[in-house]
Amino acid sequence: MGHCTSKDQKEGKRLNRRIDEQIKKDQSMSLRIIKLLLLGAGESGKSTILKQMRILHKDGFSQQDLEMIRPVVYSNCIHSMLSILRAMFHLQIEYGEPDRVRDSQLVFATVHANKEELTEELAAAMQRLWHDPGVRECYRRSNEYQIDDSAKYFLDNLPRLSSPNYVPSEQDLLRTRIKTTGITEVLFELKGLTFRVIDVGGQRSERKKWIHCFDNVNAIIFISSLSEYDQTLREDNCTNRMQESLKLFDSICNSPWFADIHFILFLNKKDLFAEKIVRSPLTVCFPEYKGQQNQTECINYIQWKFEQLNRSSQREIYCHHTCATDTNNVQFVLDACLDMIIAKNLKSMGLC
């Protein structure tokens, strides 16, 4: 009887040891998985940053991937022109040349027929429209209506996009816009760690899905578009986009869900901001602003507006100014961010 009890005790101890070892192994494995959330309002550039991560840290995009987005490029290009033509009516802007009315009718007919092929005839009409002084004036006032940021890029490149042998480039892919619905994820290995980067739709209707991604997060990259300080939300055509972004940042930065995680802020689209700030004052969004109307001073002010929302004296906000379509810029910024996250993760594991 005593012999059996002793044997059972030894077996129990061995089992406990194996369980403890497995728990330690699982904990070690979980510490080597870094979960990053990309958060921000709609059209801030989250999906473009995720594409850049795939280019920089995965195998990028294959020739087949590029060819598959050709219809998206055509659709983005046609709908960019459509947005301008509709705005011309609402803003009561006349075409520089009367013949452009016929060209605009072709664009409307194409979209109405659900045929978003960039035919030779349509491309020629769109090129004539894009060079029309009235259309250009309407585009200059693009902050007064809803239009994709990539509009100028695609319309400037119409001759290339409409060529018979056109294959989208990596830059074309970065510029395409498809509304993010649900959750998109990229996994990559770096310096012995697995990074799991998650992008969830930023428009108001999509934010209820964010809660499903909040467990075991190591860092948040919050992305805000600098160039949207004088634009309104696509969802309501009323709320200022920058003010919406600040409100969203406030709620996330100070949420108890994220009290102990690293917080990174990307002030994105600095290239578009540089073009816009020379003609549209920052006081449109911030009437109290008294500084100079130049890129550096205005960006610093916007950064300060975000940073002052952080109510935790223990938390540092790591801020970077980015252009999500510039791979070199994104690589430089991501390298700095990922190195910081890795160093802090190693410290939490007691390895440095």
Curated annotation (Swiss-Prot):
Lipidation positions, renumbered (N-myristoyl glycine): 2
Keyword tRNA processing: no
Biological process, per Gene Ontology: adenylate cyclase-modulating G protein-coupled receptor signaling pathway
GO molecular function, one term: GTP binding
Region (G1 motif): 35-48
Residues annotated to bind Mg(2+): 47, 180
The entry's keywords: GTP-binding, Lipoprotein, Magnesium, Metal-binding, Myristate, Nucleotide-binding, Palmitate, Transducer
Keyword Metal-binding belongs to the record: yes
Region ranges (G3 motif): 195-204
Lipidation residue positions, type S-palmitoyl cysteine: 4
Region G4 motif, annotated ranges: 264-271
Gene3D superfamilies: GI Alpha 1, domain 2-like, P-loop containing nucleotide triphosphate hydrolases
Signal peptide residue numbers: none
Domain G-alpha: 32-352
Region G5 motif, residue ranges: 322-327
InterPro entries: Gprotein_alpha_I, Gprotein_alpha_su, GproteinA_insert, P-loop_NTPase
Residues bound to GTP: 40-47, 174-180, 199-203, 268-271, 324
CC per GO annotation: cytoplasm; cytosol; heterotrimeric G-protein complex; nucleus
Segments for region (G2 motif): 172-180
Function: Guanine nucleotide-binding proteins (G proteins) are involved as modulators or transducers in various transmembrane signaling systems.
UniProt record similarity statement: Belongs to the G-alpha family. G(i/o/t/z) subfamily.
Subunit structure: G proteins are composed of 3 units; alpha, beta and gamma. The alpha chain contains the guanine nucleotide binding site.
Protein name per UniProt: Guanine nucleotide-binding protein alpha-7 subunit
Organism encoding this protein: Caenorhabditis elegans
Name of the encoding gene: gpa-7
